[in-house]
Amino acid sequence: MAETSMSDIPFWQRKTLDEMTDAEWESLCDGCGQCCLHKLMDEDTDEIYFTNVACRQLNIKTCQCRHYERRFEFEPDCIKLTRENLFDFAWLPMTCAYRLLAEGKPLPAWHPLLTGSKAAMHGERISVRHIAVNESEVRDWQDHILNKPSWAD
């Protein structure tokens, strides 16, 4: 029987979210862009509605922020997901690695940490590149409310 050393086990399987380095934490993000879609909240019920309206800093084709390191200078309301506030974002998709690992679940087979690229994620249509429109092209965000996506269940 072959022995497995701790270094053979991927960091996300041997460390808790709190034990991860900042670089490991950042690498958990699959880059789907779902966090970068604007959400609307009903003022009376606090229900969150998902839109296909992407932040103006999101490159929709690559699903990457144009200014990730300086994003708060460009978008002061951009979210910063941390170990401390992870559970404040109940709307995180069911496919989100942060959510999955916090719930004790494995990463999906298409995750870039497992496949080495984002191609499988895009192929599974997990990313927003197939549905997103840039906020600069939208007049009324309410016209862009999506039926609750399956990833929001």
From Swiss-Prot:
Source superkingdom: Bacteria
Name by which UniProt lists this protein: UPF0260 protein YcgN
Cross-referenced InterPro entries: Puta_zinc/iron-chelating_dom (IPR005358), UCP006173 (IPR008228)
Pfam families linked: CxxCxxCC
Family to which the UniProt record says this protein belongs: Belongs to the UPF0260 family.
Disulfide bonds: none
Gene name, Swiss-Prot/TrEMBL: ycgN
Source organism per UniProt: Salmonella arizonae (strain ATCC BAA-731 / CDC346-86 / RSK2980)
NCBIfam families the record matches: PRK05170.1-1, PRK05170.1-5, PRK05170.2-1, PRK05170.2-5
